[in-house]
Swiss-Prot record:
Organism: Staphylococcus aureus (strain MRSA252)
Pathway info: Metabolic intermediate metabolism; carbamoyl phosphate degradation; CO(2) and NH(3) from carbamoyl phosphate: step 1/1
Annotated family: Belongs to the carbamate kinase family.
Pfam assignment, any one: AA_kinase
Catalytic reactions of this protein: hydrogencarbonate + NH4(+) + ATP = carbamoyl phosphate + ADP + H2O + H(+)
Disulfide bonds: none
UniProt keyword list: Arginine metabolism, ATP-binding, Cytoplasm, Kinase, Nucleotide-binding, Transferase
Protein encoded by which gene: arcC1
Protein name: Carbamate kinase 1
C-alpha cells in the first residue's frame, strides 16, 4: 500500500461549476479506484481560474455598490469550499456506490508565507480568465492589474505567489488520516497567512502555488508518491514547437538542466517541476507522476505521463 498526495490542477477542473462537477465526477472514479487498490490518498487542488473569477465577480459587485470588496485570502477560502464541496460530494457518492464506508472531509487550510518574500514584488501566478492581448491591455489600463502571456493560451492576470513555509492545520490533517478519513486539504495552495506577534496569523493578498504546497504536504506526511494532474499528458521540452518531446521518465538532475535552459514556462509548468524537485529532495525514496486528469487511469498503468525519481 502506498501513501499518495494527488494534486488536481485548477485549470483541469473546467471553466464553470457545471463543467467542473462533470469532470470531478469522473475524477472521483479514478481516485476511489486508488483507494480500492489499497492506497491511502490525500487530495489537494488548484484554484487559479476559480479564485480569479470569485475575486472578479465580488469586485464587480463592489464597484457597482452591490456589496463589499473581498481580499484575496477570503476569496481563496471561498474557492476551497466551492471546489472542496464538489470533490467531497462526488467522492462520497462514488464510495457509497461501491459500498465503501469512508468519511470524506474538506479542510479549510491556511499556509504560512513570509511577508518579505520577493514574490510580493514580482507577481507571477496566473489567475482567472484568459484574454486576448487587446483585452488584457485595456483591463491593465483601467484597473492596474499585471498580465502575462500564459503558455500560448492567452493573457491572464498574475498575482504574488510566495513560497509556502508551513501548513497550519498539518496536525489536524495527520489526525484525520490516522482515523481513515479521506482528506481534501491545501486547496489552491492554502490560504496565505503571515505570522504576527504572539504567534497569531493574518491573511495576505496572494495565491500560493498548489503544487509547491502539495509537495510540502507530501513531505510532511511522508508519502510515497506525489501525483500532479494538469491539462497535458506529459511534461514536454521544446513545448509548443515543431520538435516538442515528451519526457516519459526523468530525474532531478536532468530537470535542473532543463530549468537552466528555460524549458518550462513560468506560472504554468515551472512551478510543477520545482515542486517535484522539492518533494524528491525532501523525500528521496518518493516519486512524482505528472499527467492529465483524463489520463490518470492510463498513467497509473504506466501507459502515459511523466515519472520523476531521484
Amino acid at each position: 500500500m502506498a501513501k499518495i498526495v494527488v494534486a488536481l490542477g485548477g485549470n483541469a477542473l473546467g471553466k464553470s461549476p457545471q463543467e467542473q462537477l462533470k469532470l470531478v465526477k469522473n475524477t472521483a472514479k479514478s481516485l476511489v479506484g486508488l483507494i480500492t487498490k489499497g492506497h491511502e490518498i490525500v487530495i489537494s487542488h488548484g484554484n487559479g481560474p476559480q479564485v480569479g473569477s470569485i475575486n472578479l465577480g465580488l469586485n464587480y459587485a463592489a464597484e457597482h455598490n452591490q456589496g463589499p470588496a473581498f481580499p484575496f485570502a477570503e476569496c481563496g477560502a471561498m474557492s476551497q469550499a466551492y471546489i472542496g464541496y464538489q470533490l467531497q460530494e462526488s467522492l462520497q457518492n462514488e464510495l457509497h456506490s461501491i459500498g465503501m464506508d469512508k468519511q470524506v472531509v474538506t479542510l479549510v487550510t491556511q499556509v504560512e508565507v513570509d511577508e518579505n518574500d520577493p514574490a510580493f514584488n514580482n507577481p507571477s501566478k496566473p489567475i482567472g480568465l484568459f484574454y486576448n492581448k487587446e483585452e488584457a491591455e485595456q483591463i491593465q489600463k483601467e484597473k492596474g492589474f499585471t498580465f502575462v502571456e500564459d503558455a500560448g493560451r492567452g493573457y491572464r492576470r498574475v498575482v504574488p505567489s510566495p513560497q509556502p513555509i508551513s501548513i497550519i492545520e498539518l496536525e489536524s490533517i495527520k489526525t484525520l488520516i490516522k482515523n481513515d478519513t479521506l482528506v481534501i486539504a491545501a486547496g489552491g495552495g492554502g490560504i496565505p497567512v503571515i505570522r504576527e506577534q504572539h504567534d497569531g496569523f493574518k491573511g495576505i493578498d496572494a495565491v500560493i502555488d498548489k503544487d509547491k504546497t502539495s509537495a510540502l504536504l507530501g513531505a510532511n506526511i511522508q508519502c510515497d508518491q506525489l501525483i500532479i494532474l494538469t491539462a497535458i499528458d506529459y511534461v514536454y521540452i521544446n513545448f509548443n514547437t515543431e520538435n516538442q518531446q515528451p519526457l516519459k521518465t526523468t530525474n532531478v538532475d536532468e530537470l535542473k538542466r532543463y530549468i537552466d535552459e528555460n524549458q518550462f514556462a513560468k506560472g504554468s509548468m515551472l512551478p510543477k517541476i520545482e515542486a517535484a524537485i522539492s518533494f524528491i529532495e525532501n523525500n528521496p525514496k518518493g516519486s512524482v507522476l505528472i499527467t492529465s486528469l483524463n489520463e490518470l487511469d492510463a498513467a497509473l498503468e504506466g501507459k502515459v505521463g511523466t515519472v520523476i525519481k531521484k
